[in-house]
C-alpha cells in the first residue's frame, strides 16, 4: 500500500530515488519491476508495480476501439508505457520521452495512490494541490466518513 508524498530530485542521468519507506514493499510485491506511463487524465506520470499495471491494461484493452476517445486513451496510457526496474540503490530511470512529456527537469513530487504512485513536476503539483472542490465530488464520495 503506497500512501503519502515525498519531494524527489532528478539526477543528471534522469533517475529518481524511491524513498526508503517504499523500497521493501516494491521488492516484495513486484521484485522492483515497475511500469511508468503517462497518467491518462492529469499532467503527471503514473508508476505501477508491473502486475498492477497489467491488470489495469487488461481492463482497458477490453474496451471497444470504436470510440475515438478510448483509442486515444489507449495510445496515451499503453503506448507511452515503459517497463523500468528499481536498482539496488532504489533508483528509477525515467525515460527521456516521459520526462519531456511533463517537463520534468529537476524536482518531482511522488504521490502515493494506494496501489500506484503519481510523479508530478514539483511546480505542477503545487498548482494542483489544494484545488479540491468538495461540492463537485459525487454524492457517494461526499458521504464517506473521513
UniProtKB/Swiss-Prot annotation:
Domain of life: Bacteria
GO BP, one annotated term: negative regulation of DNA-templated transcription initiation
GO cellular component terms, semicolon-separated: cytoplasm; nucleoid
Subcellular location: Cytoplasm, Nucleoid
TM helices/strands, residue ranges: none
Assembly information from the UniProt record: Forms oligomers.
Entry's family note: Belongs to the MraZ family.
Name of the protein this chain belongs to: Transcriptional regulator MraZ
Source organism of this protein record: Alcanivorax borkumensis (strain ATCC 700651 / DSM 11573 / NCIMB 13689 / SK2)
Gene name as annotated: mraZ
Amino acid at each position: 500500500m503506497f500512501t503519502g508524498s515525498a519531494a524527489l530530485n532528478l539526477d543528471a542521468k534522469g533517475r529518481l530515488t524511491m524513498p526508503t519507506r517504499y523500497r521493501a514493499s516494491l521488492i516484495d510485491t513486484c521484485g522492483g519491476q515497475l511500469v511508468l506511463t503517462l497518467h491518462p487524465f492529469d499532467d503527471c506520470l503514473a508508476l505501477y508495480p508491473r502486475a498492477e499495471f497489467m491488470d489495469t491494461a487488461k481492463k482497458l484493452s477490453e474496451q471497444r476501439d470504436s470510440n475515438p476517445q478510448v483509442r486515444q486513451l489507449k495510445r496515451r496510457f499503453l503506448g507511452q508505457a515503459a517497463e523500468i526496474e528499481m536498482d539496488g540503490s532504489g533508483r528509477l530511470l525515467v525515460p527521456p520521452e516521459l520526462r519531456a512529456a511533463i517537463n520534468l527537469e529537476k524536482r518531482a513530487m511522488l504521490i502515493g495512490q494506494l496501489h500506484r504512485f503519481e510523479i508530478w513536476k514539483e511546480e505542477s503539483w503545487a498548482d494542483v494541490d489544494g484545488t479540491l472542490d468538495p461540492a463537485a465530488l459525487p454524492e457517494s464520495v461526499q458521504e464517506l466518513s473521513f
